[in-house]
Curated annotation (Swiss-Prot):
UniProt: (6S)-5-formyl-5,6,7,8-tetrahydrofolate binding residues: R22, E79, K119, K453
Protein name: tRNA modification GTPase MnmE
Organism, scientific name: Shewanella sp. (strain MR-7)
Residues the entry annotates as binding GTP: 225-230, 244-250, 269-272, 334-337
GO cellular component, one term: cytosol
Length: 453
C-alpha cells in the first residue's frame, strides 16, 4: 500500500456554507504546522486561521486532528473546515499541496486506506458510496446497516462455518482408517445442509438488497393489443409509448426509469408476442424474450375482454412454460373499465392477479404498491443490508460449490473432493468482504467512489 499523504475536498464541489478539506497520511502533521502554525489537540475542534506560505490568512475555520490509528482511515488525519466557496477551497488545497510529499487523492482513496488498515471491510467501504448515492429512505437505511457491519456479520458467520466444516473433513482425510466413519456418520452432512440453508437465506436478503440499491427490472409482456404500452405510460406518468388500436404497434423494446417513493424501477415495454412472418416484428419479439429472460419480474398483461381466466397456465400455457423457472410473474388483467371486474387483488395458484384499466388509471396505484412491496419497500421498519451484483455473483458461486460438495458427499463419500468444494466456497465468500480479493477488483471498486471519500 502507498504511504503517500493525500488531500481532497470532502464536501461536494460548488458553493456552500461550509467546505471541508481532508488530509490523510503521516505528513498531515506537517500540513498542520505549515497551514495552522501548530498541531491541534487530537479530537478537539480548534478555531484558527488558515494561512498561505507568506503568513497571509486564506480563510478562518475549524481544524480537527485525528491521530492514527484512531481515525477513519487509520492514518493521521487533518480536516480543515472553512467557508464553502469553491475559490477559497481551491486556494486551500493549493496551499496544502505546497507541503512536500502531499498529492491529490484518487477517487475512493480515503476509504481504500481505511480498508487496507482494517478499519472496515470491503462491504462496509462499498456501503459508504451506497449511502451517499441512496435515492430513498429504504436504501439509506439498508446502506447504513451494511456500513455498521450487518452484511459482513452474515458473511463472516458463513465463512467460519465453512472453514470449520472443511477442517473437520480434512481431519477425516488425515485418518484414512476412520474416514468412512467420519463421512458417513451424518455429522458432516448435517453441518453441510445447515450451511446451505443459511446461505440460501443470505442470498434472498442480498437479492432484496440489490433491488433496493440498483432497482428492479420489470418487463411488461403479453399478446399484441393487450395494453402493454398503455400500462408503461400509466406507470411512467407520461406518454412514452405510442398507443393505437392496431395490434403490433410496438415493435421494439421501450424503457422507462422511474422512482416509486424513491425506489428505482426499470420498466420495459416489449413487442406483442405471437407467431408472425413479419421480419421486423420477429426481431422485436426476439428482443422481448431477451428482456424477459433477464428480468426480475414479469407483468403478464392480459386483455380482460378476451378471456375470463385468471390462472396464467389457463390463459397462455406456452408462454408461462417458456419463462425461467425462478422468474416471478404478476398477472395484470387489463381493460377493467370495459369488463366491470372487481379491482381487488387476488391470489390464483401462487400468482398475484391485478385488475386494472391502463387507459383510465383504475387499479394502477394498487399495482404500484405491489411493485414497491416486491422491491422491499417498508415505510416504518429498519432496512436490511444493501448488496451489489458482485455480492450476488459471489454468493451464487459459493452456493454452486456447496451443492457440488453435497453431491460428492452423498453419492461418492469423496472427502477430498468435498474439502476442495468447501475451499472454493470459502474463497468466494471471503471475496465479498475482501479477505481474499484481487488488486484489480479493489481498484475497480474504489475508483467508482467520489473523490474525498
Amino acid at each position: 500500500m502507498t504511504t503517500d499523504t493525500i488531500v481532497a475536498q470532502a464536501t461536494a464541489p460548488g458553493r456552500g456554507g461550509v467546505g471541508i478539506i481532508r488530509i490523510s497520511g503521516d505528513k498531515a502533521t506537517d500540513v498542520a504546522m505549515a497551514v495552522l502554525g501548530h498541531l491541534p489537540k487530537p479530537r478537539y475542534a480548534d478555531y484558527c486561521d488558515f494561512k498561505n506560505a507568506s503568513g497571509q490568512v486564506i480563510d478562518q475555520g475549524i481544524a480537527l486532528y485525528f491521530k492514527g490509528p484512531n481515525s477513519f482511515t487509520g492514518e493521521d488525519v487533518l480536516e480543515l473546515q472553512g467557508h464553502g466557496g469553491q475559490i477559497v477551497l481551491d486556494m486551500l488545497i493549493k496551499r496544502v499541496l505546497e507541503v512536500e510529499g502531499i498529492r491529490i487523492a484518487k477517487p475512493g482513496e480515503f476509504s481504500e486506506q481505511a480498508f487496507m488498515n482494517d478499519k472496515l471491510d470491503l462491504t462496509q467501504a462499498e456501503a459508504i458510496a451506497d449511502l451517499i448515492d441512496a435515492t430513498s429512505e429504504q436504501a439509506a437505511k439498508s446502506a447504513l446497516q451494511s456500513l455498521q457491519g450487518e452484511f459482513s456479520k452474515e458473511v463472516h458467520e458463513l465463512v467460519d462455518q465453512v472453514t470449520h466444516l472443511r477442517l473437520y473433513v480434512e481431519a477425516a482425510i488425515d485418518f484414512p482408517d476412520e474416514e468412512v466413519d467420519f463421512l458417513s456418520d451424518g455429522k458432516i452432512a448435517n453441518a453441510l445442509y445447515k450451511i446451505i440453508d443459511k446461505l440460501s437465506v443470505v442470498q434472498a436478503s442480498a437479492k432484496q438488497g440489490s433491488i433496493i440499491r440498483e432497482g428492479m427490472k420489470v418487463v411488461i409482456a403479453g399478446r399484441p393489443n393487450a395494453g402493454k404500452s398503455s400500462l408503461l405510460n400509466a406507470l411512467a406518468g407520461k406518454e412514452s409509448a405510442i398507443v393505437t388500436e392496431i395490434a403490433g404497434t410496438t415493435r421494439d423494446v421501450l424503457r422507462e426509469h422511474i422512482h416509486l417513493d424513491g425506489m428505482p424501477l426499470h420498466i420495459i415495454d416489449t413487442a406483442g408476442l405471437r407467431d408472425t412472418t413479419d421480419t421486423v416484428e420477429q426481431i422485436g419479439i426476439e428482443r422481448a424474450w431477451n428482456e424477459i429472460n433477464s428480468a426480475d419480474r414479469v407483468l403478464f398483461m392480459v386483455d380482460g375482454t378476451t378471456t375470463d381466466a385468471v390462472d396464467p397456465h389457463d390463459i397462455w400455457p406456452d408462454f408461462i412454460n417458456r419463462l425461467p423457472a425462478n422468474l416471478g410473474v404478476t398477472v395484470v388483467r387489463n381493460k377493467a373499465d370495459l369488463t366491470g371486474e372487481n379491482l381487488a387483488m387476488t391470489e390464483e395458484k401462487g400468482y398475484s392477479v391485478y385488475r386494472i384499466s391502463a387507459k383510465t388509471g383504475l387499479g394502477v396505484e394498487e399495482l404500484k404498491q405491489h411493485l414497491k412491496s416486491l422491491m422491499g419497500y417498508q415505510s416504518n421498519l429498519e432496512g436490511g443490508f444493501i448488496a451489489r451484483r458482485r455480492h450476488l455473483e459471489a454468493l451464487d458461486i459459493a452456493a454452486s460449490h456447496l451443492q457440488l460438495g453435497k453431491e460428492q458427499l452423498e453419492i461418492y463419500l469423496a472427502g477430498e473432493l468435498l474439502a476442495e468444494e468447501l475451499r472454493m466456497a470459502q474463497l468466494a465468500l471471503s471475496e465479498i468482504t475482501g479477505r481474499f480479493t484481487s488488486d484489480d477488483l479493489l481498484g475497480k471498486i474504489f475508483s467508482s467512489f467520489c473523490i474525498g471519500k
